[in-house]
């Protein structure tokens, strides 16, 4: 990884003290990073081995009682489910797994959500756009259910 590229934003934010590594978790990583930045990480392979429910329990356990901001990178999905991204990498999670995780975040005190890396020029059949819209919709539904 270069000193500054699309994959170093978290490293730079941590180095500048903008991210509390003890309160952070990254799920679904598939590329290797030499820098141990102190963030709890669950790779895509670990998710496949552990199962979606166990990973969700791990997420909830790690973040319970904290204020949570979710940043969802669409390329966590396997290119079969999200081909329209700038960095497709095989071995990602399925869209149903992403939806299960997003829906399962309901117990957390989430204050915001973003979804990034959708690239329409690479999304010829709008497969990625549909997945992204569904994920965002489900998160909005989770937030609405928290209000009631």
Please report, for each region that a protein language model flagged, where it lies by residue.
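Conserved alpha-helical scaffold segments that buttress catalytic/binding sites
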Residues: 1-148
């Amino acid at each position: 990884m270069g000193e500054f590229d699309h994959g170093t934003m978290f490293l730079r934010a941590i180095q500048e003290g903008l991210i509390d590594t003890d309160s952070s978790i990254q799920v679904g990583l598939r590329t290797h990073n030499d820098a141990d930045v102190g963030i709890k990480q669950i790779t895509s392979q670990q998710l496949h081995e552990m199962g979606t429910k166990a990973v969700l329990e791990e997420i909830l356990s790690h973040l319970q009682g904290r204020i949570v901001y979710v940043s969802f990178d669409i390329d966590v999905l396997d290119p079969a489910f999200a081909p329209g991204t700038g960095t497709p990498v095989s071995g990602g999670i399925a869209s149903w797994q992403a939806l299960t995780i997003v829906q399962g975040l309901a117990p957390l005190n989430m204050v915001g959500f973003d979804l990034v890396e959708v690239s329409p020029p690479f999304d010829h059949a709008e497969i990625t756009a549909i997945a992204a819209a569904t994920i965002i919709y489900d998160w909005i539904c989770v937030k609405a259910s928290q209000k009631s």
